[in-house]
């Protein structure tokens, strides 16, 4: 049986875990993984609504989100590598020193 509320609860829990991780962690890679977890929670919501409503619009939109997330991962990891080569650390507090 397809119960929409179960999928939405799981999605909300995943999004909450990702939000807590972004707000509390100081390691840039862990924060990046939490952002990806939040994006996957949104994808789960889109797929759940798409299946519940019986159309494919939500599933097509998920493919666009996954494409943007892949580009974000490539650019984000490249920035982390450049930052690590500069500062020898991937701590979020050290990134604050990059301001003018």
Swiss-Prot record:
InterPro entries: NADH_UbQ_OxRdtase_chain4L/K, NUOK/Mnh_C1-like. GO terms for biological process: ATP synthesis coupled electron transport. Its EC number is 7.1.1.-. Coiled coil: none annotated. The chain crosses the membrane at residues 4-24, 29-49, 60-80. It is found in: Cell inner membrane. It is a multi-pass membrane protein. It catalyses: a quinone + NADH + 5 H(+)(in) = a quinol + NAD(+) + 4 H(+)(out). Keywords: Cell inner membrane, Cell membrane, Membrane, NAD, Quinone, Translocase, Transmembrane, Transmembrane helix, Transport, Ubiquinone. NDH-1 shuttles electrons from NADH, via FMN and iron-sulfur (Fe-S) centers, to quinones in the respiratory chain. The immediate electron acceptor for the enzyme in this species is believed to be ubiquinone. Couples the redox reaction to proton translocation (for every two electrons transferred, four hydrogen ions are translocated across the cytoplasmic membrane), and thus conserves the redox energy in a proton gradient. This is NADH-quinone oxidoreductase subunit K. It comes from Trichlorobacter lovleyi (strain ATCC BAA-1151 / DSM 17278 / SZ) (Geobacter lovleyi).
